């Protein structure tokens, strides 16, 4: 029986060693699994961080694109405005030439040609957003510049009496105010 006990004892030791080895393998496996789970959590956090950075970078890109488009449009508007301002003295000269030609009876054909040229010029300006400032009615300091005040019993104070030089607006911005005389009783 001793032999049997010894066999049993050896078997128990072997089982114990195998159990210990299995426990160690299980602990290693559990430890490896925990490490993998921690790495997965780290990767998920890194993914979320990178995704957030991407979303922010894309939003910044879109905002920059919109700002550049707006700046480009403003630059074009400013350039158009400067060109329109440069054309106003040419228009003034054309109007004075027309007045001079109309006062000379021998220059009828020239006056007619100047009139057609002036009308065409004004149509082109209008097509591009330039409009003549109206001068009938009340004085508006945003649109008109008063060069003189004149008494007139037939009109109310602040009413425009005479236009001395036409004014123009470009897309609701004053290029040049109308130069007017205003009633002051």
From Swiss-Prot:
Species of origin = Helicobacter hepaticus (strain ATCC 51449 / 3B1)
Q: Which InterPro entries match?
A: GrpE (IPR000740), GrpE_coiled_coil (IPR013805), GrpE_head (IPR009012)
Source domain of life is Bacteria
Listed under subunit, the entry gives: Homodimer.
Q: What is this protein called?
A: Protein GrpE
Q: Mind listing the UniProt keywords for this protein, alphabetically?
A: Chaperone, Cytoplasm, Stress response
| Entry similarity comment | Belongs to the GrpE family.
Q: What does this protein do?
A: Participates actively in the response to hyperosmotic and heat shock by preventing the aggregation of stress-denatured proteins, in association with DnaK and GrpE. It is the nucleotide exchange factor for DnaK and may function as a thermosensor. Unfolded proteins bind initially to DnaJ; upon interaction with the DnaJ-bound protein, DnaK hydrolyzes its bound ATP, resulting in the formation of a stable complex. GrpE releases ADP from DnaK; ATP binding to DnaK triggers the release of the substrate protein, thus completing the reaction cycle.
